Design a protein with these regions (language model features):
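Alpha-helix boundary/N-cap detector
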Residues: 1-5, 35-47, 147, 151, ...
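Assembly/oligomerization interface modules of large self-assembling protein complexes
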Residues: 48-132
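Extended, compositionally biased alpha-helical segments that mediate assembly or anchoring
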Residues: 1-62, 277-395
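Long, contiguous amphipathic alpha-helices that act as assembly "spine/axial" helices in icosahedral shell
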Residues: 118-192, 360-366
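Intrinsically disordered or highly flexible coil/loop and linker segments, enriched in small
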Residues: 61-65, 162-169, 173, 373, ...
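Short glycine-rich, low-complexity/disordered patches
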Residues: 64-72, 169, 176-177, 181, ...
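Extended, solvent-exposed, turn-rich assembly/linker loops in the middle of proteins
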Residues: 184-307
């Protein structure tokens, strides 16, 4: 082990923290060990210079990761592959002839009124697997005890679990992203794809140099008040039967216990910092209870809002159609949707194992099958902020 003398450095540090000298440039390269992958020929004792240093403590990077995505998991089933979803349209009202009686008129009670019922079938899955091989005999020589070996193996299993969590979480977010793109692409009226910034500027009569821009919106308390109000209004509106909030034009309502609200962390934290913290009655401007996500598609290389709020995807134009369309949406700050609008169904996780007796190792294949679906006949609303001069949120 290399031992370095740092008395000169520590004396100058003492002077700095006691206020006896100004801030000096400190050479910390001799203080902080950055680690290395393997031992070198200098890793010997400082007495006879030939005894190899021993590992005194082993720390395994074995932290569990639970993920951070909205909960849209549904049930699974063993037999059959198709998810069938059946719905009925609202029947129309007719004349109540009880109050229109005419002498000598026959009133036929035997008319058949056929209900209008439709069914959707979801019959697709996605799949992947994570393979990993394990040895026992070959790796024993690197540890001092069975407990250390078990901790090492446990770390490998945990690495697989973390890998599976990251991958399944990303697919859940892609299910939401696809619905965002479908909604923005299919809404020309701004009812389901709501550009809060455009609506705010219109409401306030702002134009030209006075218009509020997307890069300043999340630090503007007045805009944040307006956005919070609109999101709360939509949460109430979706509880009332309407055809406006789903692309299929179906009569739908979403009760509070079946309403999902997912907000981008940038927006949720901006509301807390710039709005709620400076308001005496913050309950009046507080956002509805919601889940938060740090990004929709990815963080980019900087976690900048322009990256975290953006999705860039290719969507299928119609159910079962091979026609596709590229859609880019920027400035997405939140979504609100019915429990049945999207989901993850028939999830099947399993492990298959094979032992190789010749080379004395075994391999596990961690397999994953699942069905992800969007239903455009259910309520789904997107909230975004985009400068109107840039052409809105979709492309």
């Amino acid at each position: 082990m290399e031992v370095k003398q740092i008395y000169t450095l520590i004396n100058s540090v003492t002077g700095e923290i006691l206020g006896k000298s100004d801030i000096l440039k400190e050479d910390l390269s001799n203080v902080v060990d950055m680690g290395k992958e393997l031992f070198s020929n200098t890793d010997v004792d400082n007495y006879v210079k030939s005894l190899v240093n021993r590992v005194g403590k082993t720390v395994f990077v074995n932290r569990k990761y639970s993920g951070k995505v909205p909960s849209v998991l549904m049930d699974a089933w063993e037999f059959g592959s198709v998810l069938q979803k059946i719905s009925a349209d609202l029947p129309s009202a007719t004349e109540n002839e009880s109050w229109e009686l005419v002498n000598g008129t026959s009133y036929d009670p035997n008319v058949f009124y056929k209900p209008t019922v439709s069914a959707k079938f979801y019959n697709s899955k996605v799949t992947f697997e994570v393979p990993l091989s394990f040895t026992e005999k070959q790796v024993k020589e690197s540890f001092n005890s069975a407990s250390e070996l078990n901790a090492f193996i446990s770390m490998l299993y945990n690495a697989v679990e973390k890998s599976m969590t990251v991958k399944t979480d990303s697919l859940i977010m892609r299910t939401i992203n696809n619905m965002i793109a479908q909604t923005v692409d299919g809404d020309t009226m701004g009812v389901r794809a709501v550009n809060l910034l455009k609506n705010y500027n219109t409401l306030k009569g702002l134009s030209g140099a006075n218009v509020l821009t997307a890069n300043k919106a999340l630090t503007d308390p007045e805009f944040l008040k307006y956005a919070s109000m609109q999101i709360a209004l939509y949460a109430d509106r979706l509880g009332t039967m309407s055809t406006l909030f789903n692309q299929g034009g179906k009569e739908r309502f979403t009760p509070k216990d079946m309403l999902h609200i997912v907000l981008l962390s940038d927006y949720a934290q901006a509301t807390k910092t710039y709005l709620e913290s400076d308001t005496f009655n913050n309950e009046l401007v507080k956002l509805p209870t919601a889940e938060t996500v740090p990004y929709w598609q990815g963080s980019g290389t900087s976690f900048d809002f322009s990256k975290t709020s953006k999705i860039n995807v290719t969507i299928s134009k119609k159910n079962g159609s091979s026609n596709t369309k590229d859609v880019t949406v920027s400035g997405v700050i939140g979504v609100m949707f019915d429990r049945d609008a999207l989901g993850v169904s028939n999830l099947d996780r399993r492990v298959t194992t094979n032992y190789n007796p010749k080379a004395e190792f075994f391999s596990n294949w961690y397999k994953f099958d699942c069905g992800y679906f969007n239903d455009l006949n259910e309520n789904f609303v997107v909230f975004y902020i985009a400068d109107t001069t840039s052409g809105g949120g979709g492309a």
